[in-house]
């Protein structure tokens, strides 16, 4: 049930019937204050202005053409021309009952799309660090939400699995006569990487061999491909451990690395040159874009092939866009990477469109995110200034959560405690990030995330557990409740409206790639349930009020659990 969408469609038709120009935009929003109704239509004044009419008079014309029988119990014109909508109690009750019993809350997408979501994207032969956290968890929350809404989602883990570094790694593995590379731990591989780089910088013979291996690898040499595949497999096995711990849905089948697009690059560059988009400049092939200016005010040049014949990230991203459109048949692509990549993505996609590689209807979106900062406002680092490994961060989260839970509930069994600690530790790291607007820099603070106060994972997880405990005390299963929902208190009405707004929150996440919209919704829902619980006795009430309130509690628990699951955060039955 998407109340906002339903009201928007009906008011739009009424506006057009009243004489508004198409496309009429009713601008229906949730009301901030109860005296202004449950929803407001704010687009009447803009439509009236275009027609040269008095807004209040036009609002009355809209009401004359608006049929909300059975949906709204009252409509009123307010201020300079707002329309306030007060929803019918019977209508709310009917849809709350449907939402509780329906599969997927009765949520369906009218026009499901095929959507490619590019996220996480770590580099091969390097361990995942905190810099990969935001892309991984934000992307995964959006993926889960898009799938829940009925879309076909293709996960694309665009790993850095190609480049000159593989020549030196293969050469160094050979030098060490380490044919058992696939059994190595990634930490060893990182040490290999540093040692290989040192040899490459200081040993010309080694560097020459490494360069030869790059050429051989790129030309498909079998030995080099085998060694390269070992490096990729070791890395992805280790990354999978992080994904599993983070409760992220990526698997090895989602890997679509840079190497996937290599065969397309020569043809793309040749075509860009043939179309006159790419021109030679000092031996390199460059596309000049009028839409971007350099510091001198001239069109900015974007290199698509280097002087030595090598390709760049831009070339690969052009190929990726083309591949996702024509091979994966996507309607929409979302690439989750940090804000510093914005210009790069805009330029790559502008070239893609200028070359005619994708239709205008093909949506290319870059939902970027800000940096992860320490409490000092600087990029998040170890105490010695090094990069924080993702594994180490998660280990510390578990240690801290263990202390928090031990203090809060020492009576948990060892098995119960382990489950709660893992859920709280990983949930806290994820929720603390996901609850912030992704476009801003985010300050990582253990004290603010591992607490049962405020908009945190522990608070949300406890809110769910608290509701479940009501049913445990009552000895009742939620699906055994057959009485109708009845609303006898304003707190019940407010709670039902919030529950029915679940789909609106999910659509916000899907439309803009912003999980914080769902976090805010869940936090408000938990607060409204708490207010309802304080004001409206449940277990001490007489039937049918008792069962009605139990149904509201069941729907609140179901919604909280589903919402947290879409964020990739686990719930527990006991804390």
Swiss-Prot record:
It is found in: Cytoplasm. GO terms for biological process: arginyl-tRNA aminoacylation. It catalyses: tRNA(Arg) + L-arginine + ATP = L-arginyl-tRNA(Arg) + AMP + diphosphate. This is Arginine--tRNA ligase. Keywords: Aminoacyl-tRNA synthetase, ATP-binding, Cytoplasm, Ligase, Nucleotide-binding, Protein biosynthesis. GO terms for molecular function: arginine-tRNA ligase activity; ATP binding. Monomer. It is an enzyme of class 6 (ligase). One of its GO terms (cellular component) is cytoplasm. Belongs to the class-I aminoacyl-tRNA synthetase family. InterPro entries: aa-tRNA-synth_I_CS (IPR001412), Arg-tRNA-ligase (IPR001278), Arg-tRNA-synth_N (IPR005148), Arg-tRNA-synth_N_sf (IPR036695), ArgRS_core (IPR035684), DALR_anticod-bd (IPR008909), Rossmann-like_a/b/a_fold (IPR014729), tRNAsynth_Ia_anticodon-bd (IPR009080). Its EC number is 6.1.1.19. Its main location: cytoplasm. A motif ('HIGH' region) lies at residues 122-132. Pfam families: Arg_tRNA_synt_N, DALR_1, tRNA-synt_1d. SUPFAM superfamilies: Anticodon-binding domain of a subclass of class I aminoacyl-tRNA synthetases (SSF47323), Arginyl-tRNA synthetase (ArgRS), N-terminal 'additional' domain (SSF55190), Nucleotidylyl transferase (SSF52374).
């Amino acid at each position: 049930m998407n109340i906002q969408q339903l009201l928007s469609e009906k008011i739009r038709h009424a506006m057009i019937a009243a004489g508004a120009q198409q496309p009429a935009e009713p601008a229906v929003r949730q009301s901030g204050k109860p005296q202004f109704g449950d929803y407001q239509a704010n687009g009447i004044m803009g439509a009236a202005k275009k027609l040269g009419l008095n807004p209040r008079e036009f609002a009355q014309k809209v009401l004359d053409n608006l049929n909300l029988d059975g949906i709204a119990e009252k409509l009123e014109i307010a201020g300079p021309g707002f329309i306030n909508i007060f929803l019918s109690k019977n209508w709310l009750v009917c849809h709350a009952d449907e939402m509780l019993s329906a599969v997927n809350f009765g949520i369906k997408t009218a026009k499901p799309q095929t959507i490619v979501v590019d996220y996480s994207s770590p580099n091969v032969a390097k361990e995942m660090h905190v810099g990969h956290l935001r892309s991984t968890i934000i992307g995964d929350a959006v993926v889960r939400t898009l799938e829940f809404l009925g879309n076909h989602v293709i996960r694309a883990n665009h790993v850095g699995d190609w480049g000159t570094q593989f020549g030196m790694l293969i050469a160094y593995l050979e030098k060490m006569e380490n044919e058992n590379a696939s059994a190595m731990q990634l930490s060893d591989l990182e040490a290999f990487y540093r040692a290989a780089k040192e040899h490459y910088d200081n040993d010309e013979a080694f560097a020459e061999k490494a360069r030869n291996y790059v050429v051989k690898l790129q030309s498909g040499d079998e030995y080099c491909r085998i060694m390269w595949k070992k490096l990729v497999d070791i890395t992805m096995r280790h990354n999978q451990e992080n994904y599993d711990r983070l409760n992220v849905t990526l698997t090895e089948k989602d890997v679509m690395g840079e190497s996937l697009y290599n065969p397309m690059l020569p043809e793309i560059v040749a075509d860009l040159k043939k179309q006159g988009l790419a021109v030679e400049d000092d031996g390199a092939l460059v596309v000049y874009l009028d839409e971007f200016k350099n510091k001198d005010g001239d069109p900015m040049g974007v290199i698509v092939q280097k002087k030595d014949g090598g390709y760049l990230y831009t070339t690969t991203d052009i190929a990726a866009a083309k591949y996702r459109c024509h091979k994966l048949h996507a309607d929409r692509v979302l690439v989750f990477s940090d804000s510093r990549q914005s210009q790069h993505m805009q330029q790559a996609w502008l070239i893609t469109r200028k070359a005619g590689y994708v239709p205008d209807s093909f949506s290319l979106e870059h939902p970027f995110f800000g940096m992860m900062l320490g409490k000092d406002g600087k990029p998040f680092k170890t105490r010695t200034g090094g990069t924080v490994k993702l594994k180490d961060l998660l280990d510390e989260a578990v240690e801290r959560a263990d202390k928090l839970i031990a203090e809060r509930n020492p009576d948990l069994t060892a098995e119960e405690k382990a489950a709660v600690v893992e859920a709280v530790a990983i949930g806290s790291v994820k929720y603390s990030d996901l609850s912030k607007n992704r476009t801003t820099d985010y300050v990582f603070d253990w004290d603010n995330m591992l607490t049962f106060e405020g908009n945190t994972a522990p608070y949300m997880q406890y809110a769910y557990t608290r509701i479940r405990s009501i049913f445990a005390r009552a000895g009742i299963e939620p699906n055994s409740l057959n009485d109708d929902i009845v609303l006898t208190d304003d707190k019940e009405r407010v709670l039902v409206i919030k529950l029915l707004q679940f789909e609106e929150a999910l659509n916000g996440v899907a439309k803009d790639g912003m999980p914080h919209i769902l976090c805010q919704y869940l936090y408000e829902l938990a607060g409204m349930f708490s207010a309802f619980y304080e004001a409206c006795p449940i277990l001490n009430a007489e039937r049918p009020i008792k069962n009605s309130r139990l149904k509201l509690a069941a729907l609140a628990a179901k919604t909280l659990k589903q919402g947290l699951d879409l964020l990739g955060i686990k719930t527990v039955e006991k804390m």
